[in-house]
Structure formats: C-alpha cells, structure tokens
C-alpha cells in the first residue's frame, strides 16, 4: 500500500505439514511452517527511512541448540525473528550516505527439562552498516563498513568487521 511518501506492506505464509502423524518418525514429525513480514517506508526529498519486522518458524520439532553452537536458518528447531531499520540521505546529486541496523534473534525450542531450563537457547545476531557513495562524471567512489556481532547465531564467534572502498572509472 502506497500513499504519497509512505509505503506499507505485509506478507504471510503458512505451509501445512501433510505427513501422516500416525506413521511419522520423531525426526519427520514436524509442525506447520510459517513466515511473516511487515514493513514501512517513508521518503521525503533526499531522506528515506524504512523499518521491517519478520518471523520464521520452519516447523522443526528438534530441540533447541545452545546459543554458543550456531544455528542454520530453516533447519534449527525454534524460530527466528528479525527487526531492521535503514536510513538513507542524498546530500546532493553526487553524494549519498546510509545506515542500516539489523537484529536477528534465534529463539530456541528447548526440551522441557531442568537441564534445558539452565541453558540459554536465545541469541541475537546484530548487524550495523554504514555506506557512502560519491560520483562525479565517469568516476565513482563507494565505501562501507559493516560489523556483525554473533555471526551465524553463535554467541562464541568473534565480531566480524568488513570495510571496503571501491573506485570505478568509466571510459
């Protein structure tokens, strides 16, 4: 839905698991999977701002994995949530800057035992990125820095940091 400078959107999907529950093994006995996304975007002149929220439950009945072991999207038990925001500003026709922050949360599905209650199954993967681009005639210079805390939903992994500068010339 778009009106003037504001845009909203939603998406939802649920897939029914049609496995016969009486003959299914514990490994194949999965729930229905579901995913949802909602977003909003506002732009006015040189400024644009956007936010989104998403949810994914792949329907896996496996027990949660501890926060220090890493997770794989769509194969881990539990569910994933994401909150993201971005802001971009065109300083002039030649220069633009933007910032993005994303927080992905893995919420484990632990077994209901005393030992499981003492284990942390939740972990946030946080991404912060800043970008800048400048162009003049046939030349462009682009740079960004991105930092990812707890990559691959693993609380023991070191924070990743990437910085890149690119220069382009057109002849």
Language model features with spans:
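Outer-membrane beta-barrel proteins
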Residues: 1-171
């Amino acid at each position: 839905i778009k009106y003037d400078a504001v845009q909203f959107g939603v998406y939802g999907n649920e897939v029914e698991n049609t496995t016969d529950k009486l003959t299914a093994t514990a490994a194949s006995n999965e729930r229905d999977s579901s995913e949802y996304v909602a977003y909003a975007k506002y732009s006015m002149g040189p400024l644009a701002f956007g936010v989104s929220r998403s949810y994914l439950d792949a329907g896996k009945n496996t027990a949660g994995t501890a926060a220090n072991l890493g997770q794989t999207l769509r194969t881990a038990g539990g569910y994933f949530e994401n909150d993201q925001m971005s802001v971009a500003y065109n300083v002039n026709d030649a220069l633009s800057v933007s910032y993005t922050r994303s927080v992905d949360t893995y919420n484990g599905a632990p077994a209901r035992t005393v030992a499981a209650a003492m284990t942390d199954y939740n972990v946030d993967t946080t991404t912060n990125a800043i970008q800048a681009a400048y162009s003049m005639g046939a030349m462009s210079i682009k740079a960004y820095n991105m930092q990812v805390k707890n990559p691959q939903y693993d609380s023991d992994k070191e924070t990743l940091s990437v910085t890149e500068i690119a220069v382009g010339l057109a002849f």
